[in-house]
Amino acid sequence: MILTEEKTYIINVTEVDTDAELGLNKKDIMIKYTNLELLHAVLASTMPYGRLSARYRGKRKAELQSRIAMVESVLETRGDQLAKAEQIMYLDTAERSAICHYLGIIYTRLIAQKLYGIDCMVPLNLIEQPGEKKFVKYNGAYRQDLIGYGKQNAWSVWEPVGRSENSQAAFGNGCRAASEIEKINENPLAKSAACMTYYERGYLNAVVKEPERTGDGTLWFPEENYFKAYYQPFFELFADEQPGELYGSSGGFELELTLPWTEEGKRGFRHLQIGTDSVTIALMREGKYDQILKRMENVLDLSKECRFCGEDGIWVGAE
């Protein structure tokens, strides 16, 4: 599949009731999404492995290119759905598992935004602890939770479960992990859920369940560190690519990335546009990341022609 190609896709998402077993009290939802919405989810899904290396010029572009190449290489278009590409069968089990996990993160973010209005989503192990270079733990251990944030200070915990098949054992583990957390700081959770992506007859599907909470755990971290973990990678991408325009911009800012084709036999390049408005850029420059999303709640529309703008204030376009 080609992320920069204008197209609308559908994915079947099964939503399971809180105290129901899979297959009972469920409903199937067909979600429509465009290539630009998926591209925005890929852009916004900073992966935890990125913190293993220090920042260098071009790091965020290289990470984004890697995520785009992965999605385009492991999925193929069948009508208006995405399916497992045949060539991934040449990979070994560990490689396929890693790819499924990364796809799970991207699609959990997309589904959470489309169905539940989640504006931001950050891996817990990218949120720094106060005054340290360490990251947030729960009960002494690192977890793979995705922390979501929506309007009106609505916090949520998501367990991404990416699998090649419908694994009830893996999904059950995700549900148990989601059920352990009750609060983020002093905020009761608006939602805690597991989201599993998997292939059925080759087609990409998903199932979401909000389990009954069995624990009273609290995740603690400064809110400003959460928003820094989400927005700083965008700022670094902007600053690396067009620093002169970024720091001298008085209007909206947009950069254009040149991407190679990942499809065999195609030559030349395609172009990806990423941008935001001038106020958001100013807040990024000042390191006031925690003010961006709260400001966006009062901004009616940043969308531009041939662009998709997320509720986070970041827009994408492609040609």
Q: Predicted segment positions?
A:
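Catalytic cores of nucleic-acid endonucleases
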Residues: G162-P222
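A short acidic/basic microdomain associated with nuclease active sites
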Residues: K114-Y138
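N-terminal alpha-helical "arm" segments
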Residues: M1-I31
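Fungal eukaryote-biased detector of long internal structured cores
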Residues: I111-K114, L146-G148
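Conserved catalytic cores of phosphodiester-cleaving nucleases, focusing on short active-site segments
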Residues: Q144-N166
